[in-house]
Amino acid sequence: MSAWLLPAGGFPGAGFCIPAWQSRSSLSRVLRWPGPGLPGLLLLLLLPSPSAFSAVFKVGVLGPWACDPIFARARPDLAARLATDRLNRDLALDGGPWFEVTLLPEPCLTPGSLGAVSSALTRVSGLVGPVNPAACRPAELLAQEAGVALVPWGCPGTRAAGTTAPAVTPAADALYVLLKAFRWARVALITAPQDLWVEAGRALSTALRARGLPVALVTSMVPSDLSGAREALRRIRDGPRVRVVIMVMHSVLLGGEEQRYLLEAAEELGLTDGSLVFLPFDTLHYALSPGPEALAAFVNSSKLRRAHDAVLTLTRRCPPGGSVQDSLRRAQEHQELPLDLDLKQVSPLFGTIYDAVFLLAGGVTRARAAVGGGWVSGASVARQMREAQVFGFCGILGRTEEPSFVLLDTDAAGERLFTTHLLDPVLGSLRSAGTPVHFPRGAPAPGPDPSCWFDPDVICNGGVEPGLVFVGFLLVIVVGLTGAFLAHYLRHRLLHMQMVSGPNKIILTLEDVTFLHPQGGSSRKVAQGSRSSLATRSTSDIRSVPSQPQESTNIGLYEGDWVWLKKFPGEHHMAIRPATKMAFSKLRELRHENVALYLGLFLAGTADSPATPGEGILAVVSEHCARGSLHDLLAQRDIKLDWMFKSSLLLDLIKGMRYLHHRGVAHGRLKSRNCVVDGRFVLKVTDHGHGRLLEAQRVLPEPPSAEDQLWTAPELLRDPALERRGTLAGDVFSLGIIMQEVVCRSTPYAMLELTPEEVIQRVRSPPPLCRPLVSMDQAPMECIQLMAQCWAEHPELRPSMDLTFDLFKGINKGRKTNIIDSMLRMLEQYSSNLEDLIRERTEELEQEKQKTDRLLTQMLPPSVAEALKMGTSVEPEYFEEVTLYFSDIVGFTTISAMSEPIEVVDLLNDLYTLFDAIIGSHDVYKVETIGDAYMVASGLPQRNGQRHAAEIANMSLDILSAVGSFRMRHMPEVPVRIRIGLHSGPCVAGVVGLTMPRYCLFGDTVNTASRMESTGLPYRIHVNMSTVRILRALDQGFQMECRGRTELKGKGVEDTYWLVGRVGFNKPIPKPPDLQPGASNHGISLQEIPPERRKKLEKARPGQFTGK
């Protein structure tokens, strides 16, 4: 009789599945028949297997057994078989189904894992798995649809629902209880790069965030080696601060290489000093036993042992004496496991798989019992599993009062694991086991985070306690009110201190200001003098005087900047009154581009009497503008002012006055002399508020002259008191007069041909109205109309400064009146000439450069010259074989004695010019000339193989032929004879010296060539054997005669030759003179010297008529 296979949806009815006489109870009675007799044994052998009489419940165990060797070490086949064998032998399950197990492989890649789940659910009645968290939620839905009980032991955040019943408490719940107990809210996750661990990290971070914890970072180790670990830890170190790092990967205690690399990298980066706690994730799925056996991976690595001191291990709890290894040992002793199985190589995950299968079976049994043995659904099985209490591999599964997790830590030596705390995720409690946690280096636990992160009823804003926020808010209010009071007090106090001391003080003395005055000349007084430009004085006319100020100057230096001093009337000022200080402080705060900056009040003694109490000079110190006043600028006729230039100046003036009027300051003394221009041609208003300062200081102003009142409004002329204070409308009138000055470039009212006194009288007492006359061609019509509005008789008819600003801007149709643009337009007419001039100068420079290059290449080889021009060093160069030429004029000493110095220079210049023309047609390099000696080389600086000997030989023949017809200009009857010496060999060439560098040759070849010349004869080419060999090898028809044995100084006796010609050489060669026996080859005979020259020679060298 065959067994019935239960469908995936549950069990059929008892009557259909298990007949009464075939139940497990009857089978048990049959198996318990007494007597060991042979009939009984035969009957036992003939009985069918129990599964033949029971319904079969197939359990699928899904996991990455084929693609992950560490998961494979859990031996899921043996674990599931051991569980089903014990279930099938359990008499307490009498009448229940027969359990069979199927091991199902789960791919390590997420897409394959989903496919494996879908396939498994069609083949089994209950499924243990999957392990990949990405497949957990789809597995729950598919299992619910298929009615299959699901035990997903690898999903960190899965809750019991529907047909799903986790074998143990979800990892996220256990972790949350631990983090809450220590108040570690800020965590980071590092995952292995495999899909399974990446998805586990995502699922765990989602579960922790759902519980309100701020997961700062989830990162992977890519690559999965030491470098990837360092990079992942650097991201955590450089990111938001965290307390805990959860390592989502195989534990190093089970051989996980990624976690080994991670801990070693943390030790290298100094992150295992107690500032971070490292929590392994995979130990939450199995029971890791305390003791020294668990740390076998650290035996040969002290570095890893030190790093693991920062690790806290949260794992499932086994009762004392009931660890996974103890249970494996007992099962092997009872022959339930193969005897050859190495238990040390079995992963603790063995017990987790065993428990999942066992728990599933307990749920099936309770579900069938609840319905009387009939059909049950997957949801019923899952519900019974959640309420079941069965004996697992190392303890009781299901509802129990004992804590299900323990917290393990290493001792100080890192030699064993010990239990520090017991954790109950159901009650959310963590109680001490008697041994405290040992943090690295004896440090305390990482600082706790705010408790609001763990309170679901409180919104935690960045980890700040609400109470602290409220207290902080009150503190801010109190501090704000106190600060406002202190600020008000300190402002007045600092203002007073700034007036008398500090870098921003406004009371200046002789120690602060250095004055300048002309030497021996006169200048205008401080108060009445016009503002002259400092640029008009030469540096030889000014000097620094670190003493009392002279009355003849109003320019000084303050903190390195030029300043201008405006003197108060009088010279006996006792002190600066407080009202003056306050008034000046307000004026000093005025900051605008078109308003001169006030720097301080100067108080010192006079020039004649030292500074004494009650006597001194008081002046306003303001910034100095280099181009002087507007009055001075208009008077300089060499400065051309077009309309754009004028409108730019006027617009600056209007903007400055507009700023002052917005601040409630009436100038009262506005005139072109109180408008200054800086180096950028920006106009600035100065002397503003001067009347206020005089009034505050209680100083009576000096009566103004008629010339100073030309800018004053008529209503102010009629009221002196009002004139001293000034009005806004009066400033508008003064502005109109300044506009007339700028437009006409003349003094006020200049076109009326009246004296200042007459003008003031007519303006003060109309009618008729006395106003300037401006021609229509001097300015736009709008500008003339604006001037007329500004100098209206009635103040209320004059426009405000704001309206004046708008009207003046409309004159230029909105175009910007920038002086720089105006100056650029003025310079455009010179641009073409400037370009032509630059081009001409560039061509001249290029020509001079070419001349310099030609001169340099005449003095040095081109390659050497280029190197020197580029600034690079010229290294000495060795040449294996070159040919050198030396020549000398026979009797040059005698010729020099018979000639004037200028005649000797002409002789050498003519001769060497001839030589230079000849060497230009040969591949040779002229090395140098020393007196009458001429040195040429071939084969350097450019190598030419062995042609150097032929080039020098041909050149020597050409030179000898040319010398035969050469005559001196001052002694044409005296022949010029030369001796020539040739030699070939190696040498070194290089540039010698820094001043007038020369390209020089060094080596024995140079000496030998010189000896060949000195031992030669007139009109002869003396050739060494080394050159002869090369010429013969070239076979170009050179004709040579053997001279015989010749003694060379320093070289001994050698065979030498005369070069007498070459086949095809048709130029005449002079005949060598016949030498008398004993005669020298270095002189000129007496008969060849003209009589008149001979007398000169006899006087110069008495008794000698030949010589060199």
UniProtKB/Swiss-Prot annotation:
> Which residue stretches are annotated as topological domain Cytoplasmic?
491-1108
Q: Give the record's GO biological process terms.
A: cGMP biosynthetic process; cGMP-mediated signaling; receptor guanylyl cyclase signaling pathway; visual perception
Cystine pairings recorded for this chain: C108-C136
Specify where it is mainly localized.
membrane
Posttranslational modification, per the record? There are 9 conserved cysteine residues in sensory guanylate cyclases, 6 in the extracellular domain, which may be involved in intra- or interchain disulfide bonds.
Transmembrane region(s) = 466-490
Intracellular or extracellular location(s): Membrane; Photoreceptor outer segment membrane; Endoplasmic reticulum membrane
Oligomeric form and interacting partners:
Homodimer; requires homodimerization for guanylyl cyclase activity. Interacts (via C-terminus) with RD3 (via C-terminus); promotes the exit of GUCY2E from the endoplasmic reticulum and its trafficking to the photoreceptor outer segments. Interaction with RD3 negatively regulates GUCY2E guanylate cyclase activity.
> What is the name of the protein in this document?
Retinal guanylyl cyclase 1
Protein species of origin:
Rattus norvegicus
Q: Which taxonomic lineage is given here?
A: Eukaryota, Metazoa, Chordata, Craniata, Vertebrata
Q: Which gene encodes it?
A: Gucy2e
